[in-house]
Amino acid sequence: DRSWYNRAGVERVMGFCSEAELREFEQSCPEFERMLVRSGIVLLKYWFSVSDAEQEERFQARIDDPTRRWKLSPMDLQARDRWAEFSQAKDAMFAHTNIPEAPWFTVQADDKRRARLNCIRHLLSKVPYEDMTPPAVTLAPRPPAPPVQRPPINEQFFVPNAYP
């Protein structure tokens, strides 16, 4: 989930880049994006916006669930206390990189499923494509099958249903 826009976000807030590197990014990014668009690339930029409360819930869910704890890095825990700085960095990044040729589209993302579906729908509305939905299919009745002798279930090995 990392991108070169991290220069203006994580790297800025966490001190991983110099002021000169940040300024270079802010100047070069829109120039590069314009070049891509002039070259015929459809450039779509999406920002999945999560509220402070939702982010806190997601952090807590990761802490509470051992199978998801790996998703929570020490960097996440440090960044958690810098929510306001990250918000300001995002606003500054938008100010420098939200250009008419390649605007940012914000996706309300507190609900992951809705966010993904809304983003997919929006993306498809921005990219020309041919509808390739196959025609409807009607299943004909199956012909009668001859009797089949199957081995007894108690002679087979099954993976336990740990998640019924």
Feature-to-residue mapping (PLM):
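Beta-rich strand-turn-strand
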Residues: 1-2, 6-10
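Short, active-site-adjacent cap segments at secondary-structure transitions
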Residues: 6, 53-55, 113-115
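NTP-dependent small-molecule kinase module
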Residues: 88-91, 95-164
